[in-house]
Amino acid sequence: MKLKYIIPILVMALGTVSCDFLDLSDPNKVTVGNFYQTEADIANVCAGIYQPFKDSHYFTRQDYFTDSYARVLMFLDPGVAGGENYAFCAHSLTNAHSFISNRYNSIYKSIDRCNILIKHLDDVTYEKATTRDTYEAEARFVRALGYFYLVSEFGDVPLVLSKPGSINDVYAANVRQPKEKVYQAIYDDCAWVLASPLADLQSANDCGRACKVAALVLDAKAHLQQATDPVFTARKAELCAAAKTSLDAAWAKKFFNKLEDINVTDAFDLETQKGSKENIFQINYVSGDTNNGGSIPLYFAPQSYDDESKSLVRDVSKYSSPCLMLKDKGDKIFPEADRTKDLRFINLIGSGIFGGSPVYYTRKYTDKATTTVYYGSDIVVFRYADVVLMQAEVAYHTGDAANAMKWLNMVRQRAGLDAVSGLSGNNLRDAIYEERIREFVGEGKAWEDYLRGYSHEELTNYFKADGAAMFGEKDFLFPIPYSQVILNPEGLPQNPGY
């Protein structure tokens, strides 16, 4: 990765030296060496490890890399921005695509901030002995989360687990490491978090910070992702068992009795989302706040609404660009027969018009509390419905159909749908992964879900039949940005086909 993305503070310091080499000891200069002097300094840096989440292509527009890439959500105008938005659902990405470069760099920026924080945690003293380890636990969770997305989307990637000390260290680290090593780093970080004094679950005021249950969910998701990767077929049983252990532990720490006790809208409603008992980890935004508001609702809005009461924002004139709509009016996601009873369709899906044609859109990101373009809709990264449906996945992948249906039916019945019974084999698998698409539409999970549920051959045939004629074996990984490959062509070779 580019030097500026691995060690931004070091580069900034080097740049300062080169411009003013005669004044190297100015006591007023803030450098890596003298910035960390108080516990408050560390707290500020810890807050900064979360900031890259809000970069334009980390979580803010993650759906392009997940739901759109899986053709669950479609960008309907191929002419916008030179076709870059449309390239995801068309599977026509290149190594020069700016979204790919932005995402790759934003994730590594987040990882670098975590490494810098960990490096300097012992530079100061703390009022409470547990504070230091709490900060390290947060950094390790954020770092592990970044590596989960990198290994899932790019395959073998550079694995940087400490702050590089020199430019030579930076270039030495810019070498792709096997997926197995990356997954192990994720598990090691999650294990550290679980042994730390970090809270099991955060309060409403701190819901945007890491917690132990979030680490359990991440650990389970990574184990399940690795278990279903064809490279690790021989370890599938072992990895699924590890995933179940973490899922069981996460479920045991919930603050509610039954999933059906929580309304399907609680995780997303502006009034309830920050204190929702279903939410485990989320990216926080503040409605109407210039510095802390987000633009998420605008990425899912149609050009016009069939029902203005279901608009995503208060002032619909703020919206002008085409965005992500449910494919084929959501017919495959929400069957017509279920639409009058599925509470998710009734409460979280709306209809409108794009280009003169009817479309459906997700209403999970709605903020009518402000007339500004700074919205308060949080991005929910992990919630308990995910724990439930991953339990169903693990049960399916280990041949336990009865338990798979038990967990699957928890989500279906909460949504107002009938329980399933008597399913096995591919019918059970399809029921689980179709339910995941319905439950998490617009939440940035579909692509990883498809990879866990289906073989490369099945997905290739599916996407080609669905209209993605260009889809092929290369598309199971994103391209490494060209701007990174040229820094070390031998150590950072491009993924095949790009």
State where each predicted segment sits.
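Acidic, glycine-rich segments characteristic of secretory precursors and extracytoplasmic regions
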Residues: 19-67, 116, 180, 488, ...
